[in-house]
Every structure is written in structure tokens, then in C-alpha cells.
Amino acid sequence: GCVLGHLRSAAAYSAHRTQVLRVELAALAKALPAEVPVVVLKGAAYILQDLESARGRLPGDVDLMVAYDDLKRAEAALLGAGWAAEEINAYDQRYYREWSHELPPMRRPGSSVELDLHHTITPVTARLKPDTALLFTDLQVVEGKRFLVLHPQDQILHAAVHLFQDSELFANLRDL
């Protein structure tokens, strides 16, 4: 009785969060320049591909990656379409711009989904980092979608990177 109710509630909440993420992806597809290849990463990529590992997720953000040379153009398009970065101090802004693998988190007004716009999958300061150009050579098309995803082996590599570089061990084991 009670446990079954909790499980049904969790499944419904997961379905809701997945739908919210899909709505955000649709808005992003309209906002980003069509000529810029955009890669969906991590959980949003699993959902986009309808992978088994996507089931039961509670997505709260979407991670996208563009080539470094397309970063300013993609950011400008997002800002022009209403996304805005969190207010951060000059030190943190410089950190994101010079040393991180992503821009400061962005959000669209009225949306609960945070957007992380990456230009590679590991921080610039990471000891081990993949050749981002190679990641872009094996991108996979998701049928009927504007977005691309990493090659399945690169998705595993990315999950492994997060497993060993992040502190959220349990969630990252599931992704791997």
C-alpha cells in the first residue's frame, strides 16, 4: 500500500521532470543557431536517446556542448532568446571563462531547468583530458532531433570522468 504509493509518486515525478527537460530542449533547439552543432551530454542525452539508464531520472539541468569556436555565438543566441547567467563575482566569472570547461550556469525566466553550456567535457585544469576535436568527429545523430550526442564509447568515457572527478559517487555509478 504505502510503499507502492511512494513508488508510483516517484515514477510520476520522474515522468514530469523528464517532460520539463524535453520542453527545455525544444526551446533550446529554437534558440541556438541551426548551423552550430550542439551536443547533448549526460542525463539529458540518455533521455533524448530513450536509453534504459534514463528511466527514473530526476533531471534538473541540461548540459550542452559546442565547439570552443562556437561558444560565443551560442551564448549570444541564448542570451538573445532570454536565457541569463547567474549573477557571479568577477573572480568566478574569470574562472569560468578561462579555466572551466563550461560557462556560468544559465536559466530561462520561468524555467526550473539550469543550462550548462560546455566547450569540452573536462576542466581546462584537469590532469587528464580528452582531445575535444576527436569527440566531435564521432558525434551521433538522434533521429528526428536537432541535437547530437557523443558516440556511445565517449558517453561512457564522460560518465567515467564524472565518476572520478565529482563527489556524487552513487549517481555517477548509475550513469556508468
Where are these regions (language model features)?
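Conserved NTP-donor binding/palm subdomain of two-metal-ion nucleotidyltransferases/polymerases, i.e.
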Residues: 1-60, 66-176
